[in-house]
Amino acid sequence: MSTFFMFGKYTQEALNSISAVRTRKAVNMIQKLGGRVKSVYALLGNNDLVFIVSLPNAAQATVASIALTKMTGISFTTSIAIPAEEFDKQFNHNKN
């Protein structure tokens, strides 16, 4: 499983529909795709929220991002999170 950060930006319509029920539906949808929601945070700044999720692969992350946008009206940008240890190892491996 890989970790993904799914950053969301509310539209006015999505903002007006904030609810715990919608959040639970989003979590359930990720689980149906074979994933697990590690955390969900509301943010201040450029993004309004972030889902930190584990999913089998980038293809499933893409499906989840599109499905969440369709379900919630929230625009999502999804990024894979690479553990620093793994990133350092790959970087040093490619330097040689």
Which role does the model predict for each range below?
Residues 1-96:
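A compositional/biophysical signature of low hydrophobicity enriched in polar/charged and small residues
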